[in-house]
Amino acid sequence: MRCLTCLKLSFKPLCPNCLNDLPLSLKVRVLEGVSVYSFYAYSEIEELIKSKYALIGSRILPLLSQKAGKEFVRILQEKGLNIPLYGIAIDDKIKSFYSHSAALLKGFCQGNLKPTYGRLRANNAVSYAGKSLEFRANNPRDFTFRGDESLDYFLLDDIITTGTTLKEALKYLKTLNTKVHFAIALCSADE
């Protein structure tokens, strides 16, 4: 196999050098009173994040999320947040042979972060990719939660643009009295 970036021989779709060269740029936004952390600028990983639409994304996305997860676990440990936190990937339905959000969650969860799958599903399967804020507001996801409401959670999504999806998920989980400590987006498109 060859690295998709530099074309050198590699056991993974991104060689260690190219993965290390991708800069982490931690950003924090607050939505619904919850901190949302993003780790890459969309412009830096645009071609890689678009791999989510193809099967190769199942190999690329975990590499990106493992790198970000390693850094984030270090930050959590510095802040003394060592309790088990359970990750919820937003709408981790299988499309094109795998779930890109579940692949991200699996890669991100390290240390005290534990993945849970199939917990938060959208009843409205509309795609927000390239759509306006008005379209997003008029077509809510209408989430359903199938998890233990007594656990401590964090949310994960691939890209944060307007924050519409995360806001809706956070509002919905708040109505269920489900404790969400923070949310994570692999990259931020609000550059």
Model-derived features with residue positions:
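Short cysteine-rich clusters marking metal-coordination/redox-active sites
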Residues: C3-C6, C15-C18
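A phosphate-binding catalytic loop at a beta-strand-loop-alpha-helix junction
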Residues: L155-A169
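Histidine/lysine/aspartate-rich catalytic loop segments that bind and position anionic ligands
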Residues: K106-S127
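Active-site-facing substrate-recognition patch
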Residues: P16-Y86, I94, L120-S150, C187-E191
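Short functional micro-motifs and their immediate structural scaffolds
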Residues: K8-F11, P23
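Glycine-rich phosphate-binding loops at beta-strand->alpha-helix junctions
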Residues: A89-S101
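PRPP-dependent phosphoribosyltransferase catalytic core
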Residues: K167-E191
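A structural signal for isolated positions on well-ordered beta-strands in alpha/beta enzyme cores
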Residues: Y86, F154, H181-I184
